[in-house]
Amino acid sequence: MAAANDYIVRDIGLADYGRKEISIAETEMPGLMATRAEYGASQPLKGAKIAGSLHMTIQTAVLIETLKHLGADIRWVSCNIYSTQDHAAAAIAAAGIPVFAVKGETLTEYWDYTSKLFDWHDGGMPNMILDDGGDATMFVHLGLRAENGDTAFLDKPESEEEEVFFALLKKKLAEKPKGWFAGLADSIKGVSEETTTGVHRLYNLAKEGKLLFPAINVNDSVTKSKFDNLYGCKESLVDGIRRGTDVMMAGKVAMVAGFGDVGKGSAASLRNAGCRVLVSEIDPICALQAAMEGYEVVTMEEAAPRADIFVTATGNKDIITIEHMRAMKDRAIVCNIGHFDNEIQVAGLKNLKWQNIKPQVDEIEFADGHRIILLSEGRLVNLGNATGHPSFVMSASFTNQTLAQIELWTNPGKYERQVYTLPKTLDEKVAALHLEKIGVKLSKLRPDQAAYIGVSQNGPFKPEHYRY
């Protein structure tokens, strides 16, 4: 149980409002509700102490309460300074679950809250991490690295965020007894990671032989990446831009940087709103896909003076540079739907004239007098300026997260310090849990048909190498 007032939220009085929306979301999240029904009695997460770092939304509240229903003890923070829905955080706090999340956190607050994940109210430590973007995971890894004597990197931050993060690590190293980070790393039995950026971090750590505990890559489950990343962005991107700007989308020229799953959903979102969509890509396969879908594939240099709306969706840095923004039309809209804010060179804009229009909407004026409108300071536009993906598509992602937590917790000897994905049988199970809600009726293979194509009548129906 949580200690009294073991939370930081904007207004606990919003809890009733949050609870009403959580109730509605539960109806739209059949995968999570089915998981509660299947595993509730057996309590597979009993004894698990989960440190969760994932956008504190209404949908995440349903995930948190599912984990609790399955026996877990939980502490939670948001993984983005703008993505918290304050009424969702209040409802979770009122339910007795420690949560530290406020929409519009400073970077100092963000990293302070993240550190609270690891200070359990009873003096203990978490033994599981549920992560989105990898910040909680990196807290453990970089903290242990510094504790072991390699501290030079703490004096060489490469961004404002790293400056704040490294200052926090120095503070923790001074406060905690020697060996605290080592004990924390030993305590963690595994991590499940939600998003592309965090997965890249995990694979890099594993490649270097530095991963401290087993990891499950939830992002690359088909029922996550091909649904959350694609269909979620298809609905939430334009929602964020409209709430931020009230701009007429139809007839505008929009530029999407990147044509992976997130880029595909983003381009479709803009096209469905009536935009003429340009796409940039480095990968010839993705570029060909974009062209075959009817998008004009150009470079950012070509698009900068042409487009009215710019969206980055690459997971890479410096995609929209200061020079690109100098070349844009007056009051071009610039935003990002990738996990981190470095896809746009926001740091290079700080010495220009800023005018805040409303929360998460800023107008920035260049020396020549032309302006851009920047949404969510280059952070996730769909969560900063709107409320993120709809509940139904998040149910699939979060059912994968729940199954990954169960797998890591109940089979601790099965996994080494590597990155794994969930088996296709579970992917198909997650999809199946969502069919009845939308009226889908599956066909059934006859025994002779199953034998003909070499699969079981009950699946899995595709080989592991199949690309959906």
From Swiss-Prot:
**Needs which cofactor?**
NAD(+)
Q: What molecular function terms (GO) are annotated for this protein?
A: adenosylhomocysteinase activity
The note on cofactor binding and number reads: Binds 1 NAD(+) per subunit.
In this chain, substrate is annotated as bound at 57, 132, 194, 224, 228
Transmembrane annotation, as ranges: none
Coiled coil ranges: none
EC number(s) on file: 3.13.2.1
> Any idea what job this protein has?
May play a key role in the regulation of the intracellular concentration of adenosylhomocysteine.
Q: Which HAMAP family does its entry note?
A: AdoHcyase
Its recorded name reads Adenosylhomocysteinase
Upper taxonomic lineage: Bacteria, Pseudomonadati, Pseudomonadota, Alphaproteobacteria, Hyphomicrobiales
